[in-house]
Amino acid sequence: MTRKKRRLILIAACGSVLALAVGLILYAMSGSIVFFRSPTDIAKQAIAPGTRLRLGGLVKDGSLRRGPDQTVDFAVTDTNETVEVHYKGLLPDLFREGQGVVAEGVLEPGGQFRADTVLAKHDESYMPREVADALKAQGRWQEGGPNRGGPAPKPATAAADSTLGPRSER
């Protein structure tokens, strides 16, 4: 066997082992991959009930309803479509109506979403691009985050607010 032929066989064997390793890794991860969807994606695509996914958008104003035993119902919207969400548990401190949210759970028959994890958006990095684009088109978005229709509140400082107490300078 010539040196060139041995090298070719070695390269082919290494390539086969690498392809097998990548295939096994992807197969092992396929059960834990959770796809991200917006309410419009859920409405337009035929997603089977029981499918595990992440739902992202804004908590619709006026949709938050608290029930017994820490149950919470609310609606997530991307300004085009809305999905009803049912969640049992403690909500994050930053969770409120009009705020961005990502909920992970299962799509149930009838289009309702049963969430087992809710994450509140605290900066624009959690906002899905489609939702941010829709908010920009409606004029509800300014650079740095959604626009609530008024100026941003000024931060409270000891010098500006006497209720915080005197400012000590050393």
UniProtKB/Swiss-Prot annotation:
The transmembrane residues are 8-28
A Gene Ontology molecular-function term? Answer: heme binding
Location (main, coarse): membrane
Tell me the name of the encoding gene.
ccmE
Identify its membrane topology class.
Answer: Single-pass type II membrane protein
Family as reported in the entry's similarity comment: Belongs to the CcmE/CycJ family.
Question: InterPro entries given for it?
Answer: CcmE, CcmE-like_sf, NA-bd_OB-fold
Q: Name one Pfam family in it.
A: CcmE
Q: Where does heme bind?
A: 122, 126
- Periplasmic topological domain: 29-170
- The protein's name in its UniProt record: Cytochrome c-type biogenesis protein CcmE
Q: What are the UniProt keywords, alphabetically? A: Cell inner membrane, Cell membrane, Cytochrome c-type biogenesis, Heme, Iron, Membrane, Metal-binding, Signal-anchor, Transmembrane, Transmembrane helix
Q: Which SUPFAM superfamilies match?
A: Heme chaperone CcmE
Per UniProt, subcellular location reads as: Cell inner membrane
Cellular-component GO terms for this entry? plasma membrane
Q: Gene3D superfamilies, alphabetically?
A: Nucleic acid-binding proteins (2.40.50.140)
Biological source species = Methylobacterium radiotolerans (strain ATCC 27329 / DSM 1819 / JCM 2831 / NBRC 15690 / NCIMB 10815 / 0-1)
Instruction: Map out region (Disordered) in residue numbers.
Output: 132-170
* Task of the protein: Heme chaperone required for the biogenesis of c-type cytochromes. Transiently binds heme delivered by CcmC and transfers the heme to apo-cytochromes in a process facilitated by CcmF and CcmH.
